[in-house]
Amino acid sequence: ADDPIRYWRDKQGREMDFVLSRGRDVVHAIECKWSADALDGSALKAFRALYPKGQNYLVTPSANEAYQIRKSDMDITVCDLGSLLGLL
């Protein structure tokens, strides 16, 4: 069976748009923004403090092709929705 797509939010109000469990202790984090510049990284950093294993994705319509950025000491794959489906 496929693992469900979930949402994550902590008591401080930081949230991840989507989280996907992929095996034992591996959770992919997915944020959706209009542009890569809109990501501040604080929610992702808080999420990764609790769930350190997994890939980080930023989905934006402005990404013509997938590329990597580093923010808040984390590697993040920036891509559009079509590319994300291929990466997962």
Where do the language-model regions lie?
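A cross-kingdom feature that marks ATP-driven nucleic-acid transaction machinery
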Residues: 1-88
